[in-house]
A protein has these predicted regions:
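Outer-membrane beta-barrel channels and translocator barrels
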Residues: 11-14, 56-60, 126-128, 159-161, ...
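Solenoidal tandem-repeat scaffolds enriched in leucines and small polar residues
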Residues: 13-90, 94, 106
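General secondary-structure edge motif
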Residues: 33, 45, 101-102, 134, ...
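Transmembrane beta-strand segments that form the barrel wall of outer-membrane beta-barrel proteins
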Residues: 1-5, 18-25, 130-140, 235-236
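Short, surface-exposed basic-aromatic patches at helix termini and helix-loop junctions that form
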Residues: 6-12, 155-156
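Face-selective signature of the C-terminal outer-membrane beta-barrel domain
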Residues: 61-63, 113-119, 131-135
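Outer membrane beta-barrel transmembrane domains
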Residues: 66-122, 140-151, 155, 161-256, ...
Length: 264
């Protein structure tokens, strides 16, 4: 379940606006997945506070800026993710001693502070019948994870009914302070069940030092004023940057999306 409210005020003949919003998301996470911690249904609650500014620079260009603070709380681990640790059985016994690699559920903090800043600019070029949209997004949380996203998008009208949207997006992030590919050498003794308390640990590659590039194009066909169809093709490339995580865990993807929008 999610709830949201927003207020907005316009100034300078509607060319400048200030907005503020509050949202609350109440989720339930089923931890009883195969290989998961089997803690049953766990709660996850995410309140967010947003402040936004919008400025129309002229008839063809605008800029907007948003700040968002969130504080997720509850079960924040991923029940599908595990981390390994090597343990020695029967140490000192010349016949029975052996190393065994065990898997444990990850253990993330049960509280998180997130900060997001988003800057977007739009410019319409009348002679080309197209517009350029550029944006930059900064994200950070209290586990030292920082992310930077740059996106460029061109919207080109072709005739009266078709719009082409080529896109490029680049994302780069630093790793969370509790990310490790294994627990070997960390001195951490994992618990059998995640509890949200220290020590924290996760081998989820999405928390590692990585970069991604997305190349895409979208074609929208406006059948009528109220009905449109679209086709998107995206190429998604991911690269690990820590020199430790196996590159094979980073997924590349080709994605095709079909859509329809009907307003009534």
């Amino acid at each position: 379940r999610s709830y949201a409210t927003k207020i907005s005020r316009r100034f300078a003949k509607d060319t400048f606006s200030v907005s503020a919003g509050l949202s609350y998301q109440d989720d339930e996470v089923d931890s009883g997945v195969p290989g998961g911690p089997a803690l049953g249904i766990q709660s996850k609650r995410t309140p967010e506070l947003m402040l936004g500014l919008y400025r129309m620079l002229d008839a063809y260009s605008s800029v907007s800026f948003n700040l968002t603070y969130g504080r997720p709380k509850g079960y924040l681990s991923d029940p599908y993710k595990q981390i390994g640790a090597t343990e020695t059985l029967f140490p000192g016994d010349p016949l029975l001693e052996q190393d065994v690699f065990y898997l444990y559920p990850e253990n993330r903090p049960d509280k998180r502070d997130t900060f997001t800043a988003y800057l977007e600019g739009k410019k319409y070029f009348s002679e080309l019948e197209g517009s350029l949209e550029t944006s930059y997004r900064f994200f950070a949380d209290n586990s030292d994870l920082q992310g930077h996203t740059i996106e460029l998008k061109w919207l080109q009208r072709v005739g009266e009914k078709i719009v082409l949207q080529p896109l490029y997006r680049f994302y780069k992030q630093s790793q969370a302070d509790f990310y490790n590919i294994t627990l070997d050498g960390t001195g951490i003794s994992p618990s059998l069940q995640p509890n949200g308390n220290t020590p924290y640990y996760s081998a989820d590659y999405r928390l590692s030092d990585l970069s991604t590039s997305t190349f895409g194009i979208k074609i929208t066909y406006f059948k009528t004023q109220d009905l449109s169809f679209d086709l998107s093709l995206d190429r998604y490339l991911v690269k690990g940057r820590d020199g430790v995580t196996d590159q094979r865990v980073y997924p590349d993807a080709k994605v095709m999306t079909l859509g329809m929008q009907w307003e009534f």
